[in-house]
Amino acid sequence: MAQHLPPVGGNGGAHTQPSLPALPAHLQSDTHLTGHLASRFHVSLPTAKLSSHAFISINTYTSSSKGQDGGKAGSAQGEAEDMADRAFLRLGHRSENQAILFLGESGSGKTTIRSHILTALLNKTSTPLSTKVSLAAYVFDTLTTTKTATTPTASKAGLFYELQYDTASTTSPLLIGGKLLDHRLERSRITDVPTGERNFHILYYILAGTSAAEKTHLGFGEPDAGTGSKRWRYLGHPTQLKVGINDAQGFQLFKTALRKLEFPRSEIAEICQVLASILHIGQLEFESSENTTVAGDESGGFSHEGGQITTVAKNKDVLAIVAAFLGVSAAELQTTLGYKTKIIHKERVTVMLDPAGARANANELARTLYSLLVAYVIENINQKICAPEEAIVNTVSIIDFPGFSQQSSTGSSLDLLLNNAAAEAMYNLTLQNFFDRKADLLETEEVSVPPTSYFDNSDAVKGLLKTGNGLLSILDDQTRRHRTDMQLLESLRKRFEGKNPAIGVSAATAKLPGSNFLSENTAASFTVRHFAGEVEYSIKGLVEENGEVISGDLLNLVNSTKSDFIARLFGQEALHTVTHPQERTTVMQASVSSKPMRAPSVMSRKIRPGTARTTRQRKESISGRQDTLDDIASEAGDSRRPVNKPSEEGASGQFLHSLDNVTKSFHAQNTNAYFVFCLKPNDRRIANQFDSKCVRTQMQTFGIAEISQRIRSADFSVFLPFGEFLGLADVDTLLVGSEREKVEAVVDEKRWPTNEIQIGSTGVFISERCWMEIAQLSDMVTGRFGVPESEGGTPLANMPYGASKERLIAAGNSPYNNDKAKSGYFGSNDIDGRSDAGVSAFGGGDMFKNLDTREQMAERGNEKSMVEVEEFKDSPSRKRWVFITWMLTFFVPEFLIQHLGKMPRKDVRMAWREKLAINFIIWFSCLAAAFILVVFPMLVCPTQYVFTGEELSAYNGKDGKASYAAIRGQVFDIGSFIPRHPLPYLPSKLFTQYAGTDITGLFPVQVSALCQGTTGSVNPAVLLDYKDTNITDSPNVFNSQDLNSRYHDFRYFTNDTRPDWFSQMMITFRGTYKKGNIGYPAQVVQKMAQQRNAIAILNGRVYDFTKYIAGGRDFRVKYNETRPTDQSLLDFMDPSVVRLFSDRSGEDVTPLWDALRLDPTLRKSMQLCLDNLFYLGDVDTRNSVRCNFAKYFILAVTIILCSIIAFKFLAALQFGTKNMPENLDKFIMCQIPAYTEDEESLRRAIDSAARMRYDDKRKLLIVVCDGMIIGQGNDRPTPRIVLDILGVSETVDPEPLSFESLGEGLKQHNMGKVYSGLYEVQGHIVPFLVVVKVGKPSEVSRPGNRGKRDSQMVIMRFLNRVHYNLAMSPLELEMYHQIRNIIGVNPTFYEYMLQIDADTVVAADSATRFVSAFLDDTRLIACCGETSIANAKSSFITMIQVYEYYISHNLSKAFESLFGSVTCLPGCFSMYRIRAAETGKPLFVSREVVDAYATIRVDTLHMKNLLHLGEDRYLTTLLLKYHNKYKTKYIYRAHAWTIAPDSWKVFLSQRRRWINSTVHNLIELIPMGQLCGFCCFSMRFIVFIDLLSTIIQPVTIAYIVYLIVRMVLTPDLVPVLAFVLLAAVYGLQAIIFILRRKWEMIAWMILYIIAMPIFSFGLPLYAFWHMDDFTWGNTRVVTGEKGKKVVVTDEGKFDPSSIPRKKWEEYQSELWDAQTSKDDTRSEASGFSYATKAPVAVSEYGFPVNPYGAYPPSRPGSTTGIPHMPHMPYSASRMSLAHSEMLMAGNRQSQFGGSQFNLPQSGSEMELSNLAGLPSDDALLAEIREILRTADLMTVTKKGVKQELERRFGVNLDSRRAYINSATEALLSGQL
């Protein structure tokens, strides 16, 4: 039985024994050991020793520094410091590397014990570096720890912290550096915070610790109302913001730590901005929106014209904050988040994301930012604290990985798997150390140790971690191969089923409940039997998660950042990028490293002894990074890289590699290991409570009983050869005997236990305790090296959070108990005094004070790097228009448009001014039309409210008529007066008898009260008779003899004299009841004058002096008064006035009245008398000439409008004959552009085109796919959908070929693939050609997408070059080859092209109808058919369009067709004549049409409306412009159905496009004098009327409303006739569909009429104002040097020579030469690919050089699904055309001389170099040697070497870049 040490602690209780192996054998079970730990725990001794290099610590959830009696002895901190002392001793005295490994579950206190050990080690060296090392650990924990359900600070990343020492010169090691190695941060937590837990602490710190000014800058804002806290998506529930953690103080400490680690203030601020942007990314909300802003790269049919469904951010303010901090444009960020580019089957495909997908994309961005930020901070810390590796002698490694978990709190299977794999590996290291370490040496030394049984987890470790065929390796391999989850599961089954008991795999298929059939098992998983329990891992999504692919869209976005910090963040080595194999500067995707950027120093020295290795951050941009020369030198032999490239490794592969490094460093020779077992006392974090079951489970998990048993047998830590042992023992030299005998004597003297010392054949195995005793170092352990604890340390030492923020905290207390301890991250007594002042100043205030504001960042992010493309001159017409625009909008200042309108760009502001000017013109036109239709007639003939006698008689109160009566020439409504009569009791019949009559006689007047005479007064006794027959001798006159007149007689002679009664009564009547005046036409006045009446017209009023002249004057006085005798008193009117009316009776005396010499007072008096006593009425001018003109003018306008509609009706009736020749032998093409349509739409369109009743051999189906895009709702990219429909296998993969595209800058260079074959559907076998625009390798987002116009141009430009025999691009040559050699038809044979949209279905006889029309009329250049709505009943929006579609075709287009000039041929269904039938002259593809339609610079409002809004209409305009001798027609019998917009927003946008494009195209057509017809019968007149009717549509509706109102109010003949005419002509429309038996159109017409205000009023007004609603791109015209206008763009300058071109004959000749010289013995044919010209003379891929660049040969069968050999069947097609040509073409070879194996021809490079006058390789190599000999390798770059070579040789060396780079690398790596 082995002897053991006596119990420590005297004769106390059982708890006094600190060593578990020292307990008796019967107490060595799990239960007894747990009991012993419990007894110690309850007396505040929560630790126990296992051996001199291992101890157990139990978390008390209180202070970690208090043991029994409040002292440090027995506490966790005490044991930690004791272990640190022993490690330090061994480090100094034995020069061994030390490794301290922590094991324990989450919440067991590992992080705290680790901080104590770290603090104790750092306290032993009093250097400023120790503070930095301590601060580095704090920063690491701040970034990687979080609060979980088990602990307030759980580590979520593996830590390998290396302290670097120089132990060569002294036994007191000198700290010279440190190295932080982080292993696999739990990234899933960043965006998915588990319930009840927190995210990483730093995110809470920044939210709580920033000042008010800083919060404002970071956009944190105010808390939500009602909750008191803002709900942050990435911070979990708001309650997690207040969980007893002092976040504000933690943030201040974090900033201080970074500052002391020499991070610049600006960089700390940038770090905070990135953290804030991550929080804001979590706040982004997304929604689906119909993007109606027009862009030049749009495609698709009618259903796309109004806009496409895109995903946008709801909260644009939050988006702007994120964009500003990232240094990018908010619009670009939103676009990037709405798309995601993936690599599917080696193809880049852009997926249009829905809101959920955009949210996931934003989460990916947040995870990427945080991961890169952590990597950046750690790498920069390492740069500050890491020593050169040649100076490192020994290291102390602190290893702490997250504890084992049964399930993932974040739902990530990958994080759970990797975390548990690390725990498994660490536990295996522990077992090997205790049970297997030194086993070989023991056997060699012939020392036997009793075997001890233990649980061996080797099966699990091998199954998980074995390189090549372990589970993590298999997962990595499957990820690299892009396999599915089920394929991974199958691979795991093959590998482990029945071979490894630790891993079990579930079935891939299962029977669903209620089904007897096997289906895919959605719950498939695999199970791993870990040392701590069995865990089931779901297979779902594991492969994709392991890839951790960062989309190329995000990288492309960041590549344009204006933030230097963001550029550095994404430029570091931690970001592994995947570049395009053919364009190395293009990053397709990337991933953040899951392993440290550095390797342990032990590993580095072992692999590369004596070589320093530093890992630096790459500072180059993503797209064009250049490795510095020292990077190349350091990486040349860096074995830390795996066999596979980092970009090819998934997370599991990288993590496995990093674990392997940890394991190797742990097992390295000269490394001594220590172990700390951390246990939880209970699962509920209750302080001072010991749960025996919980602890016993952990004891069993870690096998502590077996370890203790093993230590009882063998506790050997040191092996000392006999000589070294005797030297340490200081044995008396006089002792006689051999070394072994002397050793045995010493051992016998020491009486050490046998489990701590064994004597071998050449040396002694001894425990650490015995070694320290014999080396006389035991006393040094109890003391402390360095600064005593009583001395003051750094001021930060007394701060809360003294250790690691996971102190062994007390429940309910703050987790920041300092316990008055000088330990923790800031526990060192030395600080970097250099930065104290800066730190204190930095801690308060605003860290962003001297940095750019958020607005400045946003402005900088919107800036573009512009490149000058070309000079530009405005045309004279443009200059005139700009002048008019400024003249109309001068009053709007520029700064208002710029700031209030948010239009920083000058060209956008100019477009806005143009829009405003156009709107002014349109509004003026509308006002002018309204003036002419409404105001002008009123000015010519003002409205008169007069009544003739007959008209007055009609208002007699009968038959519902009103009751009017006349008094002294004025008409009043007595019907309204009757109820208000002063005597209400009088019967109404008494009053109604006077209705329709003149009742002047009922109201006698007092002359003196109404007239002042010539003297100023008239005698009150004067009377004047009233002529009672003055209304055209009408009998309806009541004279003064009426009995009722006496009730109104208040004249002077009556008893009741009231002279002013009549005046007052008339004032009341005029104000309330007046309806007008009596009207006398001028003819009637003349007639009355002829009847001896003294009547005349004065100022349009009729006055009668008949009674005055005839003696109707008299005196009448009261009873008993004397009658006046002076007869002159009766002449109260001036004689000249009386003579005027008597002499000029029947005339208009106005000029004579004005000529009378009257005193102004007298004239005024006479006028008063005329108006009161002699007035009869007004002159009635309603039947005058000018009033008749105004009346019939309205009628004439109505007739003109209706005549146009009538002509359209007649035109619609012209097409009644049926013309269909039987045999049509013309070749036609049918082009279908595809964008993001679904499979159903595409199949309908393709099938309908293929099923057309036309000779299948003579029609060619051409589908042009506009980009590699997966539309929303689709599961495949559109090109793949098209190819699947056509039956092209996925194995057919032709090479992408270059061609010209419509785009800005470098986007003019595009690449595409060509497929061809035969499509069979319902008995039709139709040849097809598919062109897929895939884009250049440098295109990341929406590769290849250029728009529908570009898709048309692909075919138009191809046919143009075919017919003009011009040089063609590689894609066009391939198209020519496919059509001619594969399909078997010469491209020149095709005469007609039918263009339909991908959402259009054509009738079976459409092609026949069109072609027959072309054959009937050789002057016909293009025609269209009738397009109906396929989804008519899907919504009200589509319903109101049905009739409009019908009428627009059958009236408007039919009418225009009469003139042979249909101005708009819709692109959804039109056919064009490619060439003239007689001469073969190109028509549709003529040079003029193609060049004009291919306009690239579309930067003015007019051009954008032409080419971006209505390219189909503009194409028609060009045909009419350049081929004016030809016609365009409408063929109503040709029919098609399309999808119309079914939502209001899309409909509004579509009509905005149509209306505005109509206006601008008609403006283009009006100046064209070639249009047919003349004068008002010319097409120009019709075009003008169309333009005018378009811009005044709102007035048209208002005019119709005006007619209706006027008809109701004044139902005279003319308005009724006008309205009847208008209604009748619109009724003619009904005749059309009645004749054609379209009865359903009746209902559609009613809906259309209801919606007319929308079509004619609302839509035009909306369209005109939104005329400038475009995506403007980044190409614009600016003023350059010397005032010249230049075109600039941020897309780069396009070089046309980058796309090589050849004529077909030359190309065919080279093909034939290559074919005839081919070696017939070769077994595999290689198709030629005429690829893009390379920018260098020698391809870096090893291809040969030729005048057209370096071209890789295309793949076999690269052209089509049609077989190259007749005997090879093709599953989806039949081969019936041109077999001989096909055989020749199928056996092609590259004409550039290279073989299919991509081997260059020998000597080609040298020959080209010499021909170009370039230096030879030897000359270059010699100069490179010289440059590197004198250069600073820390700063020089390969680019710099090349530039220096160019300077020395005086030539451009771009073509030699590849050689220069390779030679430079070879020189640095020692290969040359």
Swiss-Prot record:
Any single GO CC term annotated in Swiss-Prot or TrEMBL for this entry: plasma membrane
Induction summary: Expression is induced in vegetative hyphae and infected rice leaves.
Binding site for ATP: 104-111
Residue span(s) of domain Cytochrome b5 heme-binding: 944-1003
Location of the region described as Disordered in the Swiss-Prot/TrEMBL record: 1-23, 587-652
Localization annotation: Cell membrane
Protein known as: Chitin synthase 6
Species annotation: Pyricularia oryzae (strain 70-15 / ATCC MYA-4617 / FGSC 8958) (Rice blast fungus)
Source taxonomy: Eukaryota, Fungi, Dikarya, Ascomycota, Pezizomycotina
Gene giving rise to this polypeptide: CHS6
